[in-house]
Amino acid sequence: EIGSGLVGSEMCIRDRNTADWTRPSALPNWHNVNIAQCFREPATYYMMTGDSAMLKASYNVHNLIRRTFGQVPGGMFGADENARMGSIDPRQGVETCGLVEQMASDELMLCMTGDPLWAEHCEEVAFNSYPAAVMPDFKGLRYITCPNQTVSDSKNHHPGIDNRGPFLAMNPFSSRCCQHNHAQGWPYYAEHLILATPDNGVAAAMYAACKATVKVGDGNEISLHEQTNYPFEETIRFTVNTPKAVSFPFYLRIPSWTEGATIFVNGKKVAANPEAGQYACINREWQDNDQVEIQLPMQLSMRTWQVNKNSVSVDYGPLTMSLKIDEDYVKKDSRATAIGDSKWQEGADASQWPTYEIYAKTPWNYALVLGKNEPLKDFKVVHKEWPADNFPFTVASTPIEVKAIGRKVPSWVIDQYDLCSELPEMDAPKGEKEEITLIPMGAARLRVSAFPNTRE
């Protein structure tokens, strides 16, 4: 009854408690968190009204902000509080709140539409941006994280970034909006790995090791056990446990970046050729302990950001790579630099919850050397052991590296705002060739992930 009442009066009340997010060429607000949360609002009304214009509006907002401010790796956009015209370089950042709200919206858009685009985008943010915004032990986070970020300190970097204050340090007492909000990131992600489908089946929409109990077919309860180290591994394995034989469709998302994906059921290859960017469906009678294996080959690829000085990013499957920068962690008193409205608990022991500032111990101002005809021909992927603590998002623990060649760009330095300066021009003088190492940008709390480059 409530739902039908809303449908009948939708035109009158849709914007009563929020702004109008259906404008075709402008946004009602340029705050990163508002955008990450509210772009899904029209699609929510589409679920009640069936008006396809509402669904189209949500897609439009997602694309609109990225056409200008999101020409960077990591899945987000430059809005270090608010997006500002002229501030589109990858040294602009986004709030940790914005990262997890984007993930949550992607997950809800996935549920509303079934479009694999939203699963893939959620993975891009989850693997490449969110992990670097927090300390490995989750006892501190920074308000702003950028695709190119070579300092993480307690200084005020305005107007290099939009907001005024100590927003780049890993401070557990400061920026309480993010302290509360970021904890939704991984739990909501886990919640949306395995989804029900309208035909009484089940879909593996996003990938991570998990166990799920679901109802399929005529209401039969089964469990799925997923085993993988994805996105650091190409193979994902599922075990189906069911008390009796049951028929249902099992959907597997095939990412758009893979070529030659293969699926095996109980060791036998499924005949169909899975299409990248779509779902593969296995519709059969399932028995207890049936095994499903999907292999998603990963290759090196490159994106060019033309509006940002033709900078490039290097991807390996769903992972975007960043320069490996040795990090110097400096412990600080969290109370000394927390912003005024933080209001931490009175009995909080600052010695147990220190702030960390992070500084570069090795040079960061490299251009990538690309091949003229085959840009990535000299790039080599190196696989390392899986970390003993099961946390792959640090410089020391990441199990994947890429060896490459770089040249230093002497003019690319820390600027007057104590930030990594904007990308240099393509013809900026460069130094001698050096071997450099790239690591997944989610493991790099200091990072260069959009590179100047030279083709040789």
Language-model-detected regions and their locations in the chain:
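Single conserved hydrophobic/aromatic residue that forms the stacking wall/gate
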Residues: 1-8, 12-13
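Well-ordered alpha-helical segments within folded domains of soluble proteins
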Residues: 4, 30-47, 94-110, 179-189, ...
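Catalytic-core region of carbohydrate-active enzymes that cleave or remodel glycosidic bonds
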Residues: 47-68, 89-139, 149-150
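C-terminal beta-rich recognition modules with glycine/proline-rich loops and embedded aromatic residues
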Residues: 58, 119-128, 133-241, 275, ...
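Non-cytosolic beta-sheet module surface loops
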Residues: 228, 240-244, 253-256, 284
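Beta-strand-rich binding/interaction modules
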Residues: 245-265
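C-terminal beta-strand-rich structural cap/linker in extracellular carbohydrate-active enzymes
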Residues: 248-251, 282-297
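Solvent-exposed beta-strand/loop surfaces of large extracellular or lumenal domains
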Residues: 258-283, 302-307
